[in-house]
C-alpha cells in the first residue's frame, strides 16, 4: 500500500508570520488575509491598526478567509509582535541608507525558508499603506526585502505585496515537500549555541546597551542620538547574532558597567 504524506501536518511549521504595522484600512487587512489563505498561510499579526481590531469591514474582502482574521493577534508595538521572531524581514519600496542588509524577494524567501526548516521563526513586516515603514521600524529587521517592479510605477497595495511574498514562499515550500527525504528535516532544531537570537532577546540587549551608552555620555548630541542608535542596531543586526553571541555581549555590558558577578 502506497504511503501518503499529510501535508496539513506541516503547514504551520513551514509558514512565516505576516506582520502589518499600523494598517489604515480594515479592507486591506481582509484582502491580506485572503492573499495569505490562498497559499495556506494563517499567521497574521497586527500592530496598532488605525481603526482598531477586530474590525467587521475586513471580512467581506477576506472572501472566506475568516479563520485567518479570527485568529489574528493584536500588538501595541513591532518589538512586542516580533519577540519570538528570530529572522525578520522588512518590506520597503524605498532605498534605505541606514545599513540594514537588503535582499531580493527571491533570496529572502530562500533564506527565510531554510531558517524555518531548521526550527526558526520568520516574519515579514509591512508598513502603513500611505507612508510605509519608518527608519525606526526598518532598523528592527535583519534584512529589507525588495520586489522587482516597474520603477516608473512602483505602487503596490499592501495585500498585493503580501501576495507576492506568499506566492514565492509557496513555490519553494511545494518544491521542498516533493522530496520525501526533506520531511526528516522539518522542525530539526539548531543547537542552542548556534541558533539565531529572536527579536525580543535582541531588543532587551539594545535597551541595556542604550542605558550604558547614555550613562557614559556616548550620545553627546541629542539631535544625532536617534540616528546613532539606529546605526548601532543595524551594525549588530548585520551580524545575525546567535543566542551565544548575545550572552557574550551581555557579559561585556555587565563587565563595563561594573555589575559582573565575577570576582
Which sequence ranges carry the predicted segments?
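Post-transcriptional modification and biogenesis factors for structured RNAs
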Residues: 1-263
Amino acid at each position: 500500500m502506497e504511503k501518503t504524506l499529510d501535508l496539513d501536518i506541516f503547514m504551520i511549521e513551514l509558514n512565516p508570520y505576516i506582520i502589518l504595522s499600523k494598517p489604515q484600512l480594515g479592507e486591506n487587512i481582509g484582502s491580506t488575509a485572503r492573499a495569505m489563505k490562498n497559499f495556506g498561510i494563517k499567521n497574521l499579526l497586527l500592530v496598532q491598526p488605525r481603526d482598531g481590531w477586530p474590525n467587521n469591514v475586513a471580512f467581506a474582502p477576506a472572501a472566506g478567509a475568516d479563520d485567518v482574521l479570527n485568529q489574528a493577534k493584536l500588538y501595541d508595538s513591532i518589538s512586542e509582535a516580533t519577540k519570538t521572531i528570530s529572522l525578520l524581514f522588512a518590506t520597503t519600496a524605498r532605498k534605505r541608507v541606514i545599513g540594514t542588509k537588503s535582499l531580493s524577494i527571491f533570496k529572502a524567501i530562500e533564506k527565510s525558508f531554510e531558517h524555518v526548516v531548521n526550527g526558526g521563526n520568520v516574519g515579514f513586516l509591512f508598513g502603513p499603506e500611505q507612508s510605509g515603514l519608518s527608519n525606526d521600524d526598518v532598523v528592527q529587521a535583519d534584512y529589507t526585502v525588495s520586489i522587482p517592479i516597474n520603477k516608473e510605477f512602483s505602487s503596490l497595495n499592501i495585500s498585493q505585496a503580501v501576495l507576492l511574498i506568499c506566492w514565492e514562499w509557496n513555490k519553494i515550500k511545494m518544491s521542498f515537500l516533493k522530496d520525501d527525504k526533506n520531511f526528516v528535516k522539518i522542525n530539526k532544531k539548531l543547537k542552542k549555541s548556534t541558533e539565531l537570537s529572536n527579536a525580543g532577546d535582541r531588543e532587551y540587549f539594545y535597551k541595556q546597551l542604550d542605558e550604558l551608552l547614555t550613562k557614559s555620555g556616548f550620545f553627546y548630541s541629542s539631535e544625532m542620538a536617534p540616528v546613532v542608535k539606529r546605526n548601532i542596531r543595524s551594525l549588530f543586526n548585520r551580524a545575525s547574532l546567535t543566542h551565544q553571541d548575545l550572552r557574550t555581549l551581555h557579559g561585556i555590558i555587565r563587565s563595563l558597567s561594573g555589575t559582573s558577578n565575577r570576582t
